[in-house]
Structures are given as C-alpha cells and as structure tokens.
Amino acid sequence: MRDTAVSSTPRRRRSLRRAFTAFAAVPTALALGSGLFAAAPATAVDVTNQAQNSLFGSSDVTDYLETDGVPQRTPIRTDEHPSIQGLPSGVSVERVEWITERRIALFIRSAAMPKELIQVQVLLARDWHSNPSAKYPEVWALDGLRALDTESGWTINTNIEQFYADKNVNVILPVGGESSFYSDWQKPDNGKHYKWETFMTKELPAVLQNGYRSNGERAVFGLSMGGTAAINLAERNPDMFK
C-alpha cells in the first residue's frame, strides 16, 4: 500500500500539469491565435502565466487587457428607430450611431433582456458602401470577464478594426455582459437578468440579416470568458457557427 501511494503522486501531479496546460491553452489560443493584437500587448507566455494565476484565484486572465481609459467617441450621425422588418416579437433597433463610416453601434430592444437597450457594435465589411446589394459573412468577437457596458475590449485594446479593414466580413462586437459568459442565467444574475445566449442566437441574427446584410454564415471567437462562451455557443448551436 505504501508503494502504491508513493507511486501515484507523480501521476497525479502529471495529470494536474496536463489539465492546467489544456486550461491555459484555451484562452491563449483564442485570444492570440487570431493575430489581432497590436505589437505592444503581452506575449503568449504572459497570458499563460496569468491564466495560471487565475486558476488559483489570484488574478484575472484578462488583467493584461486593461479596461481603463475608454476613448470618447462622438458619432458622426445617428439614426433613430430604423425600420427593419422580420424581427422576432419584442425585438427592435431603437437607435444606430455611426461612429465612423465603417463602424456602427446598434442599440437593440431585446425581448429576452428588456430592462435596458443592448449595444452591439458592427465593423462593416470592406465593400459595404461600394457594393450595396452584396451580403456578407460575420465574425463575432466576444469580450472578456470584465466586459464594459460602453465599448468592447476588442476595440479599446486591440487593432481589430485595422486588422479587418481590408476584409469583406462584418465583425460583430456585443457590448456588455460582464461576468455573464454570454449564457442564460437562472440565478443569481447580478441584477442583470442575463439571457445572452437567447439574445445572441434567437434575436441578434435576425437584426443582422434583415438590417445589415448578413448572409447567414458566421464564425465566433473570444477572449478569456468570451473564448469559453465561443466554444459553448458553437457546441450548443452547431448549425449557427462554422
């Protein structure tokens, strides 16, 4: 019995190391594999170290993606109550702010989360204006654990806007959902009545297809919390993401 107990300890340690490696690889791959970050942010080693700290409760995987200093952005124009047909009952677009000619902020009334308007920013495809009859695929970029209600961390702290500027896809950036994992919560819900999965899978696609020329083909990735959510959403909705 003594020999068995001693010999099992290294195996347990190796199992823990393998489990941690798998855990750390997910946020690292999802956050860095897309090549969206500017030159200055942390390396993969830094992210893995922070993932290790997060595993033991000492920090957040998204600590390296600072959320302070949100830029002040003044829309170049605003469209109130745009007419979009074919939306689910209780869903409407209340306002569209044109931050630039290629970046818009949609403020959506959700039937699933009706308490407050939900903001979704869209980076429009390269040929959006020059080819107004074309429809475009989507790439969804989900935020980290400390997601702000004002703007996605992807546009605050990475070069995602510049990276996709020459690509013919609409980039979809849900705003908000701090600590939600973009899921439907039962309780407790932080006073937010989180129904993010319902919103993103049952309501948002109709807005994008009927109002913003989506062709129904989409992919999803995310940072930290958003990486977990991307995997869960794709697994639970296999016909929605490719």
What are the functions of these language-model segments?
Residues 2-8, 17-242:
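Non-catalytic cap/lid and distal C-terminal segments of serine-dependent acyl enzymes
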